[in-house]
């Protein structure tokens, strides 16, 4: 069993040892080498180096994957290090492996899969977006430490988010929410051109391992 933590903050000081005592393998995603060292000190088994190219909330991330991955590899003490952030194609996987990654973590590409529960409008935005269309923001940190950065495709009525959230989002509002809220996506979004089965996406990415 694997416990995957997406924030290497102080809570991990207690959570990681408890998980390991229960026989779990602990994987921690970080956006800085300092946080990677903290996770390792607490006993993390696997580190995910999340470059600032990634979509969604970024773990203190302002460092691109090409600089971050070698820095975390240097302090990993032989632990596997996975690469995350903007990875979409076999070429991206191959580049990460050449830098020394043991594997990759992929998000946005699987939003654009047939099996994904993402709203159809969200999927369409991903297909339409170019690499230039994502933005690095700190304004949507609800439920996270204030100011936590994230990467999104901004939507046309993005500034209405507070009114929508304050009023409560009902199931019937899903179309409206998909049109108004910023949508999490990484910088690799410009290389996603079709909705395909997840297995096809995995097969494409796996070609980068050889």
Regions found by a protein language model. Give the residues of each.
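Active-site entrance/lid segments in N-terminal catalytic domains of soluble metabolic enzymes
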Residues: 1-78
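Short loop or secondary-structure boundary microenvironments that flank
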Residues: 9, 85-86
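Acidic, glycine-rich active-site loops and adjacent beta-strand->loop/helix elements
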Residues: 53, 86-87
């Amino acid at each position: 069993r694997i416990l995957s933590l997406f924030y290497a903050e102080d809570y991990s000081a207690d959570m990681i040892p408890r998980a390991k005592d229960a026989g779990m393998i602990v994987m921690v995603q970080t956006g800085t080498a300092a946080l990677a060292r903290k996770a390792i000190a607490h006993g993390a088994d696997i580190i995910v180096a999340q470059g600032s190219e990634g979509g969604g909330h970024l773990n203190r991330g302002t460092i691109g994957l090409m600089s971050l991955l070698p820095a975390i590899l240097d302090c990993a003490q032989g632990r596997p290090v996975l690469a995350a952030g903007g990875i979409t194609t076999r070429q991206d996987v191959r580049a990460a492996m050449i830098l020394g990654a043991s594997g990759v973590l992929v998000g946005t590409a699987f939003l654009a899969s047939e099996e994904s529960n993402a709203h159809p409008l969200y999927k369409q935005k991903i297909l339409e977006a170019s690499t230039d269309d994502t933005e690095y923001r700190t304004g949507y940190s609800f439920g996270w430490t204030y100011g936590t950065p994230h990467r999104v495709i901004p939507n046309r009525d993005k500034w209405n988010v507070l009114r929508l959230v304050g009023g409560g989002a009902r199931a019937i509002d899903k179309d409206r929410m998909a049109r108004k809220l910023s949508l999490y996506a990484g910088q690799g979004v410009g290389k996603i051109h079709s909705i395909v089965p997840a297995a096809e996406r995995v097969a494409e990415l796996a070609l980068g391992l050889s």
